[in-house]
């Protein structure tokens, strides 16, 4: 997927929701693994690199999109950027204390192979963390899945199940930790305010990259119909989403 096309607006998501639960979980892993050298694979615009850099000696970010990497500002002397693929991981063996992926594993072509390669890069006692969306949502609803045809099917095709992720970690020789929910995302929009919501804009998320223009427009049309139907009753349509981000962790023994 061409993330360079949305790099200019990508960080808007963190202004809306800074994902403090994810930050807390990552800081906890840094502490638990006594990590000094970190690698984020699929680092995008470097949000988590900049968040964790003050706590460690070195943070390396790898991403395949040069457009996203060019958005990383104020690197400082603790952050290193590498334009490359999760399919190769061009780093020395046993060179990191913590490797983490936030909302990116579903983009990797060889997900199991990535986990195997990551295990080789970990120092003894180090950890691999995969954080991502629970698809389909275990609780509540998703406006995107409810209104946009093909969105749920597309995400199901690219997000591996959490049991699968855990089995890949175990097969790679990692000691699998209990799966944790690290973030609850809840929001509610009333009436026409939903049409201005960042996350339903055409470039608001990668899920829409998997939809045709006609599928995307069909979703917008459905939302408009729901708004109009509520207004005809003298009411205001209510759009709710409640999602979870989970974290799978494997420790190098």
Regions found by a protein language model. Give the residues of each.
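Conserved class I S-adenosyl-L-methionine
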Residues: 1-34, 47-51, 68-71, 127-157
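Class I SAM-dependent methyltransferase SAM/SAH-binding core
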Residues: 39, 45-88
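Conserved Class I S-adenosyl-L-methionine
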Residues: 45, 176-253
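A conserved beta-strand element that flanks and buttresses the S-adenosyl-L-methionine
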Residues: 100
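Short catalytic micro-motifs in class I SAM-dependent methyltransferases
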Residues: 103-104
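A short glycine-rich, Lys/Arg-flanked "PGG" loop and its adjoining helix->strand segment in the class I
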Residues: 112-124
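Short alpha-helix
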Residues: 157-172
């Amino acid at each position: 997927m061409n993330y360079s096309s949305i790099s200019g607006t990508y960080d808007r998501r963190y202004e809306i929701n800074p994902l403090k639960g994810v930050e807390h979980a990552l800081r906890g892993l840094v502490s638990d693994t006594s990590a000094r050298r970190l690698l984020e694979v699929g680092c995008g615009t470097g949000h988590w690199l900049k968040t964790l850099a003050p706590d460690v000696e070195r943070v390396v970010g790898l991403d395949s999109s040069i457009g996203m990497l060019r958005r990383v500002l104020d690197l400082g002397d603790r952050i290193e950027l590498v334009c490359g693929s999760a399919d190769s991981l061009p780093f020395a063996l046993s060179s990191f204390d913590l490797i983490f992926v936030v909302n990116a594993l579903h983009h990797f072509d060889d997900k199991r192979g990535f986990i195997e390669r990551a295990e080789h890069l970990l120092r003894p006692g180090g950890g691999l963390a995969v954080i991502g969306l629970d698809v389909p949502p275990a609780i509540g609803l998703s406006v995107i899945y409810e209104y946009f045809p093909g969105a749920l099917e597309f995400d199901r095709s690219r997000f591996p199940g959490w049991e699968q992720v855990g089995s890949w970690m175990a097969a790679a020789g990692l000691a699998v930790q209990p799966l944790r929910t690290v973030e609850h995302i809840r929001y509610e929009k009333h009436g026409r305010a939903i049409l201005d919501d960042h996350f339903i804009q055409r470039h608001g998320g990668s899920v829409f990259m998997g939809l045709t223009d006609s599928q995307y427009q069909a979703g917008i049309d459905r939302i408009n119909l729901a708004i109009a139907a509520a207004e005809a009753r003298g009411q205001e349509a209510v759009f709710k989403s409640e999602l979870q981000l989970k974290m799978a962790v494997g420790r190098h023994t």
